[in-house]
Amino acid sequence: MQALMLAAGMGKRLGNYTKNATKCMVPVNGKTLIEYAIESLIYAGIKKFTMVVGYKKDVLKNFLKGKYPQIQIDFIDNDVYDSTNNIYSLYLARDVLSSDDTILLESDLIFDKEIIREIVSSPEKNLAVVSHFENWMDGTVTVLNEEKAIKRIVSKSDFDWNKIDSYYKTVNIYKFSKEFSKNIYMPFLGAYQTAYSKNEYYETVLKVISYLDGDILKAHLVEGSRWYEIDDPADLKIASTRFSSGKEHLESMYKTFGGYWRYPAMLDFCYLVNPYFPPKALVNEMKQMSDILLESYPSGDKQQSLLAGKIFGVLPEHIAVGNGAAELIASISELSSGKVVVPFPTFNEYPNRFGNENTVWLPANEDFSYSVEDIVRSAEENSASYVLLINPDNPSGHFFTKQEVIVLAEQLSSKNVKLILDESFVDFAEPEIRFTFIDDELISKHKNVIVIKSISKSYGVPGIRLGVLVSSDESLIEKIQKNTSIWNINSFAEFFLQIFDKYKKFYGSACDKIAEERGRFSSELSKIPGVKVYESQANYLLCKLSGEAEKIGSLGLAEKLLDGYNILIKDLSSKKGFENGQFIRLAVRNCQDNDRLIFALKEIFS
């Protein structure tokens, strides 16, 4: 068994990464792609490796010279690499390919080293490594028959998104027998490039062969998480994350702040959503309108306020719509002056926007609780202009009842202090204590209250970025609207506001389910030795580690969960307010997901 790599291309889409070297010399986490590949070949017991090279070939040859004495490395030059494609590179290697059973691979891959060993040891003579199609994949896809053989290769023009469940993406790693290469593949390839062009892809020939004989090339199935194809800098970033480990892996995930659809196998307990909403009917209605929405401009702020006012039962003059609550937090901070009292630990977006120099930190006790009196006293002592209350608080889950918020608003009003009330998680409180200040009667009576609510978090639609700010101060609403762009939310977000009322009863039911599952989840977590769960009225739980769990630590636990179980949690070790212990925050997801996390925690702490 030998190996052959096609590495003549220029890798133009990688920009500066391939300015001075070929694509296979691009580093991923400190090691080049070619090093990963050769080490995988050596691990599989392969002794001979041939590379078809072209662009920056001398740089590559010098890099590999004497580096791997365990394996024979030969080179074939493709000096017309800039005007040909990989079909010609493979044709140049026809004698090598026909001389022995061969592992064929491309130069822009990073992959689990076990894959090469698996196909080398497989009894199947001719194999294509494939993964069940996922949305992030691009390139050649196949359809398999019942015997897991490739019966058809789907061209881009025939690709149908409605059939993706039946598609398998080629990883661009193959095993060809000597007989297949010599008697079937190379004769077809030679004839094809003579008849058509040298600027084609070798998969085109495989498409013809699979059409004529749907059993000759078997599929070797691997998980999509075990490989990645690197065509551009965005791919490189994703590959670096996928193939990192420990603290580097965790930090890489945190730094993206989302976009986790690129990691479909990962279970996200870090970011906070509503697992029971929206219902399929709402999603399908939005899908039905997707073409029109994609091609249409959204309305301006007055129409958005009208739609949001309808949902929340307030006058449009009392509500502003933002591109997520984050835009509204930024806007209110820009329009504010003076000090703001912030109970901590808290959601960092607020102190980041108001500025540490204007933030008065109100320390909570060891149970992360505080009283109305604590807040009022701090506001008075520091001559604050504002108080921020996230209710339930993030990340503690601490909760003020409706009466407590009313008392707080009244006492602050008497001191000419405004209350910024963030209700992003209040809908998840137990039904008997659930309430909202987004009510025209309440905000008209308590004119010093400014309510902010993240629709993205509460309604399970973070991708469309929606939030609202509510106040009876109409001049403030006008200022907020002037402070944002005329089209600050997109057509998909506007359409969600337009149709939401039809699904309002489903939303209430979804919030009840979260409250119920939170109780069960909290109870099960509390049974794990070394895990203390704090009471919460939100869609997340604050936990403190003790005993043996504390020795692992919050950071160590987050690393173990991500590397070993593909589960992402929020490590709070670097967050202000958690200096005296090991704390994590866990989102409340559905029962199945929560049980998967509980199983992982029990294994780690056993």
Q: What are the residue ranges of the model-derived segments?
A:
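N-terminal nucleotide-binding beta1-loop-alpha1 segment
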Residues: M1-K19
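Active-site pre-lysine segment of PLP-dependent enzymes
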Residues: E118-S122, S369-N382, P395-L419, E423-V461
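Conserved N-terminal catalytic core of the sugar/cofactor nucleotidyltransferase
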Residues: Q2-M5, K31-T102
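Conserved PLP-binding catalytic core of the aspartate aminotransferase-like
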Residues: A515, L525-Y565, V588
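PLP-dependent aminotransferase-like
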Residues: E334-L389
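PLP-dependent aminotransferase class I/II
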Residues: S166-T170, P279, G300, N448-K527, ...
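Conserved core of the sugar-phosphate nucleotidyltransferase
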Residues: D112-Y196
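N-terminal "arm"/small-domain region of PLP-dependent enzymes with the aminotransferase-like
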Residues: I238-S296, N382-S383
